[in-house]
């Protein structure tokens, strides 16, 4: 449905060339949700704005529903843009219009008959759960309600594609989850292809089928969510995945933790990282029995993304040096990532 082929975007800033996108290629199949994740300034917003040509690429092709938008005349481009909805971080609602009026605006601009406008807007109000707010003004809405209005407005022209530019960044965690649930439901019931950009891996984990990691204007890694979470190839992808975990040592251990053993009875505190099949395999207990090492689990967290389990365990290892070394080697050979955090 969306194909970006070797897209580059170069800005002229005070006489200097600034490359925002560098030879980016991305394919989002029909009906899928794709998330592009990256840090601030990585090129995310420029990329998504190239999809509907709010930013014109310096080179490359932007193919949406089989048509290269970069090759269309203005009138044809305007027509194709009606099939591409977009929502933003800051909602962009008209304060002088009611909820109903904001959603109706795209239909009015297309000279849609009033009767059809009323029918369509009421359907969209029901879809986003705002039927009782149709006569309210944006100033009387919460952030989540404003974003629901923006989503309904973006759907008014019955788009095939929905672009989401940091759509949940200005929302609190609970509201973010409700908006993500709504987007997932829209994707499932209407079959709309969704491309979203975010700096939060939690968003990708929650609703995406496919993920691409962008850094300094280049896509450095992409694949299904299950592939990336189970076997990330780049350091940046690994850091984003770790950011979804909120795991730390108990305070009493943090106070005693040292970089090197203090004495013969100082034991290592080790973090084990599991992905994919290793989560279900009893490798920790197997290694403990095999090498005679006692493992005292201090904290852990297991989660899912793209149908794949992943997680962390932090444990204290007690045993002689050789047994501990053999245990760590065994676990690494079984695709468990091992990191010594310190000694207590």
Curated annotation (Swiss-Prot):
E.C. number(s) listed in UniProt: 7.4.2.11
Localization in the cell: Cell inner membrane
Domain named ABC transporter: residues: 2-241
GO molecular function: ABC-type D-methionine transporter activity; ATP binding; ATP hydrolysis activity
Membrane topology: Peripheral membrane protein
Catalytic activity: L-methionine(out) + ATP + H2O = L-methionine(in) + ADP + phosphate + H(+); D-methionine(out) + ATP + H2O = D-methionine(in) + ADP + phosphate + H(+)
Top EC class, one word: translocase
The entry's keywords: Amino-acid transport, ATP-binding, Cell inner membrane, Cell membrane, Membrane, Nucleotide-binding, Translocase, Transport
SMART domains xref list: AAA, NIL
Residue numbers binding ATP: 38-45
Entry annotated with the keyword Lyase: no
GO cellular component: Gram-negative-bacterium-type cell wall; plasma membrane
NCBIfam families reported in the protein's UniProt record: ABC_MetN (TIGR02314)
Recorded family membership: Belongs to the ABC transporter superfamily. Methionine importer (TC 3.A.1.24) family.
Subunit and partners: The complex is composed of two ATP-binding proteins (MetN), two transmembrane proteins (MetI) and a solute-binding protein (MetQ).
Purpose of the protein: Part of the ABC transporter complex MetNIQ involved in methionine import. Responsible for energy coupling to the transport system.
PANTHER family hit by this protein: AMINO ACID IMPORT ATP-BINDING PROTEIN, METHIONINE IMPORT ATP-BINDING PROTEIN METN
Protein name, entry field: Methionine import ATP-binding protein MetN
Annotated source species: Pasteurella multocida (strain Pm70)
């Amino acid at each position: 449905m969306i194909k970006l082929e070797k897209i580059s975007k170069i800005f002229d800033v005070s006489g200097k060339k600034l490359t925002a996108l560098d030879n980016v290629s991305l394919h989002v199949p029909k009906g899928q949700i794709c998330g592009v994740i990256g840090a601030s300034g990585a090129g995310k917003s420029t990329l998504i704005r190239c999809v509907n040509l709010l930013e014109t690429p310096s080179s490359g092709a932007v193919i949406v529903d089989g048509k290269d938008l970069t090759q269309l005349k203005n009138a044809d481009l305007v027509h194709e843009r009606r099939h591409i909805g977009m929502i933003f971080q800051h909602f962009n609602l008209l304060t002088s219009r009611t909820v109903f009026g904001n959603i109706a605006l795209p239909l009015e601009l297309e000279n849609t008959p009033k009767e059809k406008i009323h029918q369509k807007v009421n359907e969209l109000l029901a879809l986003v759960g705002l039927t009782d707010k149709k006569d309210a003004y944006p100033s009387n809405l919460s952030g989540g309600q404003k974003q629901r209005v923006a989503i309904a407005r973006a759907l008014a022209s019955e788009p095939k594609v929905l672009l989401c530019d940091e759509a949940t960044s200005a929302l609190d965690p609970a509201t973010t989850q409700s908006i993500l649930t709504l987007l997932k439901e829209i994707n499932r019931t209407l079959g709309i292809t969704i491309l979203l950009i975010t700096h939060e891996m939690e968003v990708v984990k929650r609703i995406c089928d496919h993920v691409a990691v962008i850094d300094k204007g280049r896509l450095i890694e992409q694949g299904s969510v299950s592939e990336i979470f189970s076997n990330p190839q780049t350091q940046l992808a690994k850091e984003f995945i770790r950011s979804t975990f909120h795991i730390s040592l108990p305070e009493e251990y943090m106070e005693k933790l040292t970089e090197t053993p203090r004495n013969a009875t100082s034991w290592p505190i080790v973090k084990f990282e599991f992905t994919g099949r290793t989560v279900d395999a009893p490798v920790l207990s197997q290694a403990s029995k095999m090498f005679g090492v006692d493992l005292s689990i201090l904290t852990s967290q297991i989660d899912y993304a793209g149908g794949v389990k992943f997680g962390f365990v932090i444990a204290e290892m007690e045993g002689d040096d050789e047994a501990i070394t053999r245990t760590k080697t065994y676990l690494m050979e079984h695709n468990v990532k091992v990191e010594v955090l310190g000694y207590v």
